[in-house]
From Swiss-Prot:
Catalytic activity line of the entry: ATP = 3',5'-cyclic AMP + diphosphate
Species whose genome carries this gene: Drosophila melanogaster
Coiled coil: none
Chain intervals with Basic and acidic residues compositional bias: 518-533, 599-613
Name by which UniProt lists this protein: Adenylate cyclase type 2
Example of a GO cellular component annotation carried by this entry: plasma membrane
Compositional bias per record (Low complexity), positions renumbered to this chain: 624-633, 647-683
Gene that encodes it: Ac76E
Keyword ATP-binding carried by entry: yes
Length: 1307
């Protein structure tokens, strides 16, 4: 079984590579110093993954083996405890017998035999204190045989006329207490029966035993076997049900827990943990209030406003980043390529953010913004953001250089205070608000492409860590000029020592085979004979790993961009870059697309609008630490088969260049860089294969690729890296296959290996090995602990069960336990009926027929048969509904009081039958009870005596004749006690009381009978009377039966307790699961959340294409005039509270069945974005597309009018004058989820961009739409007013329409 905290990977030669890979429980991975080869890490991870899969395949067999072993050990442990109890009982009985024998002058031989029996019991009991004694079946069988034969023989010899009574107790022990199988117990019982028969024959005069008495004793011992086997069968069945039921419950519990954990991970991937905890607390309070209202109690938390989950944080730094010229690129990508490119690109930014302790907030179009200092205050928040900005610029620079696409980053940073949290009731997205956020947004707008633009406040926190120059942001942004913001530009740190090698690196899909050595050589020869002329085949710099001393050195996040940064800095580090940055800086004034701007994020005039084209991605928190550790401590080491002789220039690849030093596998001799316009002469040549296998190279962004794929679960099949073997750059016969720039962009960013959304939701080992996990939990919670004698903790945990009564300390739980239906009560009645028949057979064989005997047996038989018929008339079904539980058997099984009444009646009848016929042997008054006075009668012929004697003489003769059968009544008493114990679920205390009452009453009746009085006078000259001796032996039987009853009660109660705890825990998990489901549906569409919760699909990128979707943006432009940060409104918190009320009321409309087809996408400050027509799953290709198109548009217009009505109502209540400005459009869209740290569901397309522009260039109080959408609305009966040609930013002049609503012209 794989350890949850560590995995041992297999090396190539089959030996264990200890410390090769350590995976911590929280997902973080650390790399040992001895393991710096990335290729070896990939091989090790692949081996470990295959080992996991192999173990999972073998899990079923191992699970069955473990379960069978657990069940065997469970029964053996219980049987072992019973064995100890039986030995203790025999030891106690022998000690009491020895004491009585000494007091009454018992024969020395019998006393010595009893001493021997006590020694045997004590010795075996002592030996059992060692756990290894009964570890083997042979040892258990040996102890069982020794115990049985020794105690049985001694009981037969010392028992005299009552020998069957101790034998009865022994038979019960053989079948129910000895640690042997039931066939062995049956064989032992037969042997002991044979020994008893031989002993009876041997001790009889002239070897002629009283055959009726002998047959009666045999039947009695057979009834003991019936009783013992019944207890064993039922207890084994109960144990089996306990193990199976507990296992099922635990498996369900584990599955629910794992599902809840996945939902929790999914939830925490979107919103911070403290926000999620606060929201859960609010939901639980609402659930509690709902329960109180349902119970008729008054609500305790009535409030007029919705819960506001927003907090204020001071001293944080906000970073806004915009990708320059990304819109033309995204418009040329397919749906899958767009989602993949966005996920990889913004996923890389998320990785950089996490490495620099920044929290990404949201992605708006190609605008990416994050904050450092949330939710945990960090002193280095300003430094973190600047470092992140520099690394983002470096990352996008390599995209530009590798693909030839002119993209860049413009970054603005400001330090101040923020309000952060979530607004509304549905589709939460963590966001920040404040005037400082607005300023940071304008710092980006007024920034310079390829530079980090900061304010004076940020510079004050930076100190002298970075060199700056005047930013003059006011010349590029009016907001900065109006507020007289002093800005600066960070001077990029100088590159450290790097060696640029012209390379093109591509990622091959996981199912593509890796190139063989021959293929690699062929590719190398082809590349050496041709020159690449495509401008896109640019040079990809390769950083050579430093010596091991530098590799092992740890870096701080702030040292990445310093001039002294180590050579092995990651891709985004400025220290690893050596190619000259392109100097072109694009002006964004004519950027093609934009969306409605967020309050305090974008200007409302549309100048700096950003469209919602992309949402970022980030790896899980646990995985990022692993990636960061690998990126800072190791370089990528390619396998020998993949290493090529590397050198080249701008025009192609050649084998000329400086030879690598063979003395140091990590060293490379660089050559001088060629002048601009000439061929670059930097080269790196790899020597022989053994030498190449030790060569360490660092390809940007790829050295943590393996660890990220392994941690995200996508590394199972292995992802191959190939140089010059990709689909786009494979050379054939002197031709070079070229891709579009957008395709190259997709291929390049894919090599970064950014995690898929929700990649942290990986199948845990608890789910993989759920059977073994449940068995382990059963073993730790259900298997009784090993105990020593007199350790009463075995009889129940003191915290849950009372030590002697074993009743639950929790009264309601005790009531629940007693109210359980007993579906096996009918089997108890059957066993009691069989024991009654045994009692009747004994009496009919031994006792002469008389009216009292026949009457008692017949009455009891009829009553028991009636009870048996009623309880078996219809099979009880506890799963049936209440109305279906009308059969007699179901009523009996369900009614505890009815079962109790039947228990009392049955046992009174059986106990009475055991002694009732003794009344037939009563000496008439005035007649002497001395047997000697009637000697002549006894010696004469019965017929002549009957003729010549009086009636009194005849009765006295009958009594004298029946004197030898007196012990039979005690045998019948033993059978009646077993019948009482046969009712397994009636409570061991109740049965103990019933047995004691019955035996006392029976012995009292027998003791006062003339038969026993005459027997004592005739056969006992010294010692205890027969009834007293029988009473003591019956007490031994009671003690044995009580031990069995107590054990059965203990097992039943612990099973019920464990299941009750499981049920409570399961309900708690169900509650949290329900809460998480509510939260998930408030964040992602239900079908999207279901998609990512399926483990086999959790690593896939989710995207859907729709041909006709209506998109709407509804903003409140004059809300920014209302927002103000003063002490009166708690620095803007109360302003956000009103906005939260507005959005919550908007969200409530989505709960109406009429608007169930509308999906809220997100809110951007005071802008509400939603869409209609996003059906779950792939588009179903509706036959009536025109009708579907019309429905999507019309329902969204009705929703817009409902929004206007809601806002108008809020205005009247809050004395405000808010107005909606709505933009509407319809057409094809792409829906998908991107990002790993905080995945976002979003939609992209020109349809979305135009809908956003319809809002931003619209008029307050009006609903503006495009011409095509207006035509559909007019066909549906809506009146539209043509606005004419309207300038739309990025689209030129478009004909737009206003849809008339009841709120047009309303102030």
């Amino acid at each position: 079984m794989v350890n949850h905290n560590a995995e041992t990977a297999k090396t190539g030669n089959g030996t264990n590579a200890t410390a090769n890979l350590i995976v911590k429980a929280d997902g973080n991975a650390t790399q040992p110093k001895a393991m710096t080869s990335s290729a070896a890490r990939m091989n090790d991870a692949l081996s470990a993954s295959l080992a996991d899969l192999s173990e999972q395949e073998n899990g079923t067999t191992a699970e069955d083996i473990h379960l069978n072993d657990l069940y065997t050990r469970y029964r053996q442990r219980l049987r072992k405890s019973l064995f100890r109890s039986g030995l203790l009982t025999s030891l106690l009985a022998c000690v009491v017998s020895i004491i009585i024998g000494i007091v009454y002058g018992q024969h020395l031989v019998q006393t010595m035999l009893l001493v021997l029996a006590a020694l045997i019991s004590g010795s075996i009991l002592t030996a059992l204190q060692f756990p290894a004694v009964l570890s083997s079946p042979a040892a258990a069988l040996a102890f069982a045989i020794v115990t049985t034969f020794s105690l049985g023989t001694i009981a037969a010899i010392t028992g005299d006329e009552l020998a069957p009574l101790p034998m009865y107790a022994l038979f019960l022990c053989i079948h129910s207490m000895l640690p042997i199988s039931w066939p062995v117990s049956v064989v032992l019982a037969l042997f002991m029966t044979a020994i008893h028969i031989v002993y009876r024959i041997g001790t009889s005069p002239d070897y002629a035993p009283n055959l009726p008495m002998l047959f009666g004793e045999i039947v009695m011992l057979a009834s003991a076997s019936v009783s013992g086997l019944y207890y064993r069968i039922m207890s084994d069945a109960a144990h089996n049900r306990t193990v199976d039921g507990t296992r099922t419950g635990i498996e369900q519990r584990v599955k629910l827990e794992c599902e809840r954990e996945q939902q929790e991970q999914l939830l925490l991937s979107v919103i911070p943990a403290y926000i999620a905890a606060e929201v859960k607390r609010s939901i639980m309070l609402k659930m509690a209030d709902a329960c109180q209202r349902a119970g008729g109690q008054a609500s305790t938390s009535a409030t007029r406003f919705h819960e506001l989950h927003v907090q204020r944080h001071t001293n944080v730094t906000i970073l806004f980043a915009d990708i320059v010229n990304f819109t033309p690129l995204s418009s040329s990508l397919t749906a899958s390529d767009l989602v993949k490119t966005l996920n990889d690109l913004f996923g890389r930014f998320d990785q950089i953010a996490q490495e620099n302790q920044c929290l990404r907030i949201k992605i708006l179009g190609d605008c990416y913004y994050c904050v450092s200092g949330l939710p945990i205050s960090r002193p280095q928040h300003a430094t973190n953001c600047v470092n992140m900005g520099l690394q983002m610029i470096d990352a996008i620079r390599h995209v530009r250089e590798a693909t030839g696409i002119n993209v860049d980053m413009r970054i603005g940073i400001h330090t101040g205070n923020v309000l952060c949290g979530v607004l509304g009731l549905r589709k939460w997205q963590f966001d920040v608000w404040s005037d400082d956020v607005t300023l940071a947004n304008h710092m980006e707008s007024g920034g310079v492409a390829g530079r980090v633009h900061i304010t004076k406040q940020t510079l004050d926190f930076l100190g002298d860590k970075f060199e700056v120059e005047q930013g003059e942001g006011g010349n590029r942004d009016a907001y900065l000029a109006d507020h007289k913001v002093e800005s600066y530009l960070i001077v990029p740190p100088k590159p450290a020592y790097t060696y640029s090698v012209p390379r093109v690196v591509e990622c091959i899909e996981q199912n593509d085979p890796s190139p063989t050595t021959e293929e690699t050589k062929e590719i190398k020869e082809t590349d050496q004979s041709h020159e690449a002329t495509d401008v896109a085949d640019v040079l990809l710099p390769v950083t050579v790993a430093p010596p091991p001393a530098i590799v092992d050195e740890k870096m701080s996040p702030t040292s990445i961009n310093s001039q002294e940064a180590p050579l092995h800095a990651p891709l985004a580090s400025a220290a690893s870059m050596s190619i000259k940055e392109l100097s072109e800086e694009e002006d964004e004034a004519d950027e093609a697309t934009a969306v409605t701007e967020p309050l305090m994020h974008r200007d409302q005039d549309g100048k700096n609008d950003k469209e919602p084209k992309a949402n970022g991605g980030h790896r899980g928190s646990g995985d990022s630490a692993a990636s960061e550790s690998v990126a800072k401590s190791a370089a990528l080491s390619l396998p020998a088969d993949d290493l090529l002789s590397m050198s080249g220039s701008e025009s192609g690849i050649s084998n000329s260049g400086a030879q690598a030093q063979s003395s140091n596998p990590a060293s490379v001799t660089p050559t001088a860089a060629a002048p601009a316009g000439g061929a670059a002469s930097n080269s790196l040549t790899v020597a022989e294969a053994p030498e190449r296998s030790r060569r360490k190279l660092s390809v940007q962004g790829l050295m943590s690729f393996a660890d990220r794929r392994r941690s995200s679960g996508a590394f199972i099949e292995g992802r191959k890296l190939s140089i010059h073997s990709g689909e786009s750059f494979r050379s054939h016969a002197g031709h070079v296959t070229r891709n579009r720039p957008s395709s190259k962009m997709t291929k390049y960013v894919e090599c970064w290996g950014a995690d898929r959304p929700f990649a942290n939701i990986a199948e845990s080992k608890l789910v993989k090995n759920i059977g073994l996990a449940s068995i382990a939990m059963i073993e730790s919670n259900l298997l009784p602990p090993e105990r020593k004698c007199f350790n009463f903790n075995f009889f129940g945990p003191p915290t849950e069960l009372k030590p002697f009564t074993m009743w639950y300390r929790n009264t309601p739980r005790e009531a629940m336990y007693r109210a359980q239906p007993d579906t096996h009560f009918r089997f108890d009645l059957i066993c009691a009926f069989v024991l009654f028949l045994s009692l009747a057979v004994v009496q009919l064989i031994v006792i002469e027929l008389n009216l009292a005997l026949l009457g008692s047996l017949l009455a009891s038989f009829v009553s028991l048969a009636l009870f048996l018929y009623l309880s078996n008339m219809s099979v009880p079904d506890v799963h049936a509904s209440t109305t279906e539980r009308n059969g007699p058997g179901q009523v009996v099984a369900s009614s505890r009081y009815l079962r109790l009444a039947m228990f009392v009646v049955v046992n009174i009848l059986i106990s009475s039958c055991a002694v009732f016929s003794v009344i037939n042997y009563t000496v008439p008054d005035g007649v002497s009870k001395e047997p000697s006075s009637n000697q002549t009668i006894l010696e004469s012929n019965f017929s002549s005596v009957f003729v010549n004697s009086t009636l009194e003489d005849v009765q006295l003769w009958e009594i004298d004749y029946a004197i030898p059968i007196a012990p039979v009544f005690l045998y019948c008493c033993a059978i009646s006690l077993a019948a009482i114990s046969a009712f397994l679920r009636s409570g061991f205390i109740l049965k103990l009381i019933a047995m004691l009452v019955a035996v006392i009453a029976q012995v009292t009746v027998l003791g006062y009978s003339d038969l026993f009085e005459m027997y004592n006078d005739a056969n006992i000259t010294h010692g205890l009377p027969l009834e007293i001796k029988g009473f003591l032996l019956l007490l031994v039987i009671i003690l044995v039966l009580h031990t069995l009853d107590r054990q059965g009660e203990y097992v039943a109660r612990t099973d019920f307790l464990w299941k009750a705890k499981l049920k409570v825990e399961q309900e708690e998990v169900e509650t949290m699961r329900g809460i998480n489901k509510i939260l998930l549906e408030n964040i992602l569409p239900a079908h999207v959340a279901t998609h990512f919760l399926h483990l086999e699909r959790s690593t896939e990128l989710y995207h859907e294409s729709y041909s006709c979707v209506a998109v709407m943006f509804a903003s409140i432009p004059n809300y920014k005039e209302f927002y103000d940060e003063t002490d009166v409104n708690k620095q803007g918190l109360e302003c956000l509270r009103l906005l939260n009320e507005i959005i919550c009321d908007f969200d409530k409309l989505l709960l109406k069945p009429k608007f169930s087809g509308i999906e809220k996408i997100k809110t951007i400050a005071s802008t509400y974005m939603c869409a209609s027509g996003l059906r779950p799953g792939k588009e179903d290709g509706a036959t009536d597309e025109k009708r579907t198109e019309e429905h999507n548009v019309v329902i969204l217009v009705e929703f817009a009018i409902a929004l206007m009505s809601i806002l108008d109502s809020i205005n009247r209540e809050s004395f405000q004058r808010f107005r909606l400005r709505i933009g509407l459009n319809h057409g094809p869209v792409i829906a998908g989820v991107i990002g790993a740290q905080k995945p976002q569901y979003d939609i992209w397309s020109n349809t979305v961009n135009v809908a956003s522009r319809m809002d931003s260039c619209g008029v307050m109080g009006r609903l503006q739409t495009t011409e095509n959408t207006a035509k559909i609305l007019m066909t549906a009966g809506y009146e539209c007013e043509c606005r004419g040609l309207t300038y739309v930013k990025g689209k030129g002049n478009l004909v737009t329409y206003f849809v008339k609503t009841p709120f047009d012209g309303k102030l």
